[in-house]
């Protein structure tokens, strides 16, 4: 903002001084200032708002000072406009009028009523039902020689609050996993914002905070105060010093943004990396777990195929499950057994789906109720959702799955609060508090009495109307109401001469006159007093109900977690049965056996007349790397991805697309697939490729699964082949991970002769007289042809280009390459006209030297000397 409040105070209007005082407290926020029926922004904020919302930038008079820029929008549309600003990365402060302007003595009193940032919002206009919205804090600390990174992330709409204590180099993977909307950094670490901008979407906001907020003492005090405890040992986070500081920063920031009703955030949990697999950005992207590489949407992703959830809580948890596969066999097996039971018991599964579908978003409803942002209809929905729990509990309490039984036994049916909501909120309640009438009759005696007074008084109005019609002989006389004039008698202009003297005129219209009388005034006072008191009492009762619901936060959140997990297991069962998946066996060993595996996404999008071709995959102690060669478009990349996805599905506890599968537990899945430039970071295709390859070699273990596709494609042939060869040797000799390596370097097939652990496989083709058919079947043995020309033909290359490519390929294979040149070539292809030989420079020199020899005039000694020269030339000495 290009204005200094201190310097302007004398000449600004009182309202602008009020504005500037508020703006001074929130300089980094867009300030929306309520003026009448509009929210206005001024100065530099106005320019930003005008540009972001594409609304008119105008000017406002400012007393003796110069006119100032102004942009605004109607107050009733504020939620949509604020959502647009926040989605564009702005942080917004809302300053409202907190008294009736007509009752104000002088300047209307205004206060900050809301602060909205990308990471702190409850608005449905901003949030996605199926996505978490995380606020995240990062803290980098050093104790002695140990350097640690703390990550804390919270979704204020669901009360999920977690921390992770990491090595600094692990932070990027964590951020890419949680995908926060806003990140809090210390001023000391603000340079890390450059890293954030490289690894996260552009709209993620980085907020820099004062360094003192990142002290251990400050953080501990904030956490202990929030959770009302004197020690953090009971939370299991006492030793995670950097993560604990990050958690304190999150809570401090929420307080700074006026989030002062956070009683519903009742838990904080430590993320244990030993329990879950870490998926880096490349793996998530290359396997298309959550989104498609084509357009970034869920269409074409694993999530789209697997997601059969019935409510938003389950949908959000399913995303988290897919991004955090399990590494504990007992947890995996518990999910698999539950899915098996739900598949076998179709009637139970159907009834469960009906129950889950009737449950609304308990987590987000609770957060809005606890912060007094909720409306009566949402409270009613929460109550009706709780009413579904007994049926779900009864349905699964005798289940054949221990996990399902344990889950439903943990449900708290909350009979008392459910009954209170049922008796308090009218089923026909309006969407807004101002609509009134949402508290049921019989819930509160005082409210019933006030409503009776109002109702009886309104009946009295009808009696007055009938009496006045008789007295005046005006049959069209009506008693009506509006907010400006209150109750009045309306008489048409044609009948105005019949109006008696005791009528007091209130308003003149084009076609009518409006009056009042003493009796009407008395009733008006009774009605308005009763209505006003009734409305105030309703709001008070509703607020008290919200407080009572908030007191049950722990129980409601526990129910929400259970419902979400049941929903995910139900989703697994639905897709597993529908798609013919099988229950995998997950073991502690390092083997892997998949019989007739299928790609879970590709098989769903292929045409009916083009069935997906299944393939086997096998690893044991002896066979650790499958070197897959074969033509382009023959299915090598799909084969790699399908096996990665099958392993991932098994370890998230879902059945898998195969005839049978035994999965040796995998600690991480690494992928290096395709080529992509990171030009915004100044990184070429090859550098990106090498960075990703280095990450794999440095972090993979003997329990990992590595998927490599076309390593070395971003550089020269010999460089690329050398790197691919060396990587293969290193993985087998040092790392020992199960590896699928798809390559167009057919020379790598020779590695099978050097390593017992490497086996050659190829994607089969059938050659006919005029074309090649890709069978997409992976079989034992190496391939010696990539059939690139056939792929070019399928892509629609002109037939002349295809024919010429075949001739050039034939020549190259014979080391006798001939390319036509000259003006005669324009528009025509003449394979045998005017030829030149293309040799490497050394070969050209050798050829010229041989052609220059005149063997008819040489003596035997001359011939030997010339032969020696040719040897030197061939050896590079010439």
UniProtKB/Swiss-Prot annotation:
**Quick one: a GO cellular component term?**
cytosol
Give GO MF terms, alphabetically: ATP binding; ATP-dependent DNA damage sensor activity; damaged DNA binding; mismatched DNA binding
Key word DNA-binding present: yes
* Biological process, per Gene Ontology: mismatch repair
Which InterPro entries does this entry report, sorted A to Z? Answer: DNA_mismatch_repair_MutS, DNA_mismatch_repair_MutS-lik_N, DNA_mismatch_repair_MutS/MSH, DNA_mismatch_repair_MutS_C, DNA_mismatch_repair_MutS_clamp, DNA_mismatch_repair_MutS_core, DNA_mismatch_repair_MutS_N, DNA_mismatch_repair_MutS_sf
Q: Which residues bind ATP?
A: 630-637
Question: Which SUPFAM superfamilies does the entry link to?
Answer: DNA repair protein MutS, domain I (SSF55271), DNA repair protein MutS, domain II (SSF53150), DNA repair protein MutS, domain III (SSF48334), P-loop containing nucleoside triphosphate hydrolases (SSF52540)
HAMAP family named in the record: MutS
Any idea what job this protein has? This protein is involved in the repair of mismatches in DNA. It is possible that it carries out the mismatch recognition step. This protein has a weak ATPase activity.
Give the family, as the similarity comment puts it.
Belongs to the DNA mismatch repair MutS family.
Q: What is this protein called?
A: DNA mismatch repair protein MutS
Which gene name does the record give?
A: mutS
């Amino acid at each position: 903002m290009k204005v200094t409040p201190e310097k302007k105070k004398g000449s600004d209007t009182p309202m602008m001084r009020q504005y500037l005082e508020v703006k001074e407290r929130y300089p980094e926020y867009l300030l929306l200032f309520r003026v009448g029926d509009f929210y206005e922004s001024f100065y530099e904020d106005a320019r930003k708002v005008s540009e972001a919302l594409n609304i008119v930038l105008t000017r406002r008079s400012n007393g003796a000072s110069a006119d100032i820029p102004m942009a605004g929008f109607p107050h009733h549309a504020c939620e949509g406009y604020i959502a647009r600003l926040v989605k564009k990365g702005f942080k917004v402060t809302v300053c409202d009028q907190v008294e009736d302007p007509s009752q104000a003595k002088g300047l209307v009193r205004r206060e900050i009523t809301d602060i909205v940032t990308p990471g702190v919002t409850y608005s449905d206009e901003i949030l996605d039902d199926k996505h978490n919205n995380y606020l995240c804090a990062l803290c980098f600390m050093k104790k002695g020689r140990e350097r640690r990174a703390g990550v804390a992330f919270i979704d204020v709409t669901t009360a999920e609050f977690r921390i992770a204590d990491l090595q600094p180099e692990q932070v990027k993977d964590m951020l890419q996993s949680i995908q926060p909307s806003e990140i809090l950094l210390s001023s000391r670490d603000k340079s890390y914002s450059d890293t954030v901008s490289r690894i996260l979407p552009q709209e993620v906001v980085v907020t820099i905070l004062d360094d003192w907020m990142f002290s251990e003492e400050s953080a501990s005090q904030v956490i202990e105060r929030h959770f009302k405890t004197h020690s953090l040992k009971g939370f299991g986070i006492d030793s995670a010093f950097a993560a604990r500081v990050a958690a304190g920063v999150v809570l401090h920031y929420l307080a700074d943004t006026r989030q002062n009703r956070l009683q519903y955030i009742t838990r904080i949990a430590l993320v244990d990396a030993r329990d879950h697999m870490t998926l880096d950005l490349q793996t998530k992207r290359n396997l298309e777990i959550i989104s498609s590489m084509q357009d970034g949407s869920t269409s074409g992703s694993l999530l789209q195929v697997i997601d059969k959830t019935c409510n938003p809580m389950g949908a959000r948890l399913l995303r988290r499950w897919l991004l955090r596969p399990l590494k504990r066999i007992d947890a995996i097996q518990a999910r698999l057994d539950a899915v098996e039971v739900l598949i076998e018991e179709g009637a139970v599964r159907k009834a469960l789906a009906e129950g889950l579908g009737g449950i609304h978003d308990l987590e987000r409803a609770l957060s809005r109720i606890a912060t007094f942002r909720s409306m009566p209809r949402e409270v009613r929905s929460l109550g009706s959702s709780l009413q579904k729990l007994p049926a779900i509990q009864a349905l699964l309490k005798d289940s054949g799955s221990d996990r399902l039984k344990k889950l439903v036994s943990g449900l708290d049916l909350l009979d008392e609060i459910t009954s209170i909501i049922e008796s308090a909120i009218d089923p026909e309640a309006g969407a807004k508090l101002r609509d009134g009438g949402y508290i049921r009759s019989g819930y509160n005696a005082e409210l019933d009495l006030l409503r009776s007074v109002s109702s009886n008084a309104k009946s009295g109005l009808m009696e007055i109307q009938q009496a006045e019609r008789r007295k005046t002989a005006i049959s069209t006389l009506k008693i009506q109401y509006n907010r400006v004039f209150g109750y009045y008698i309306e008489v048409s202009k044609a009948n105005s001469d019949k109006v008696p003297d005791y009528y007091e005129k209130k308003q003149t219209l084009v076609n009518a006159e409006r009056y009042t009388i003493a009796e009407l005034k008395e009733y008006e006072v009774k009605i308005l007093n009763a209505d006003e008191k009734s409305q105030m009492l309703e709001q008070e009762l509703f607020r008290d109900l919200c407080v009572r619901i908030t007191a049950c936060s722990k129980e409601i959140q526990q129910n929400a977690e259970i419902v979400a997990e049941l929903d995910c297991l139900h989703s697994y069962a639905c897709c597993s049965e529908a798609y013919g998946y099988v229950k995998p066996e997950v073991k502690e060993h390092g083997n892997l056996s998949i019989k007739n595996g299928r790609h879970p996404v590709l098989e769903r999008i292929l045409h009916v007349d083009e069935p997906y071709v299944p393939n086997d995959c096998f690893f044991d102690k002896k066979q650790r790397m499958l070197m897959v060669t074969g033509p382009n478009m023959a299915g090598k990349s799909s084969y790699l991805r399908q096996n990665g996805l099958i392993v991932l599905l098994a370890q998230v506890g879902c059945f898998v697309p195969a005839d049978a599968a035994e999965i040796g537990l995998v600690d991480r899945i690494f992928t290096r697939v395709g080529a992509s430039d990171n030009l915004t970071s100044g990184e070429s295709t090859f550098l990106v490729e090498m960075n990703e390859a280095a990450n794999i070699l440095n972090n993979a273990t003997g329990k990992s699964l590595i998927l490599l596709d076309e390593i070395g494609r971003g550089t020269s042939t010999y460089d690329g082949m050398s790197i691919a060869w060396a990587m293969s040797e290193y993985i087998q000799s040092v790392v020992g991970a199960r590896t699928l390596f798809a390559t167009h370097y057919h020379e790598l097939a020779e590695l099978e002769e050097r390593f017992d652990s490497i086996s050659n496989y190829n994607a089969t083709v059938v050659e006919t007289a005029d074309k090649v058919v890709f069978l997409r079947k992976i079989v034992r043995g190496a391939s010696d042809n990539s059939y690139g020309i056939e792929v070019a033909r399928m892509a629609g290359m002109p037939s002349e280009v295809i024919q010429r490519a075949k001739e050039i390929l034939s020549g190259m294979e014979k080391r006798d390459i001939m390319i036509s040149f000259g003006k005669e070539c324009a528009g025509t292809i003449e394979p045998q006209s005017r030829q030149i030989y293309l040799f490497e420079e050394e070969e050209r020199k050798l050829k010229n030297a041989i052609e220059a020899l005149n063997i008819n005039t040489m003596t035997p000694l001359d011939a030997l000397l010339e032969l020696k020269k040719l040897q030197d030339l061939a050896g590079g000495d010439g």
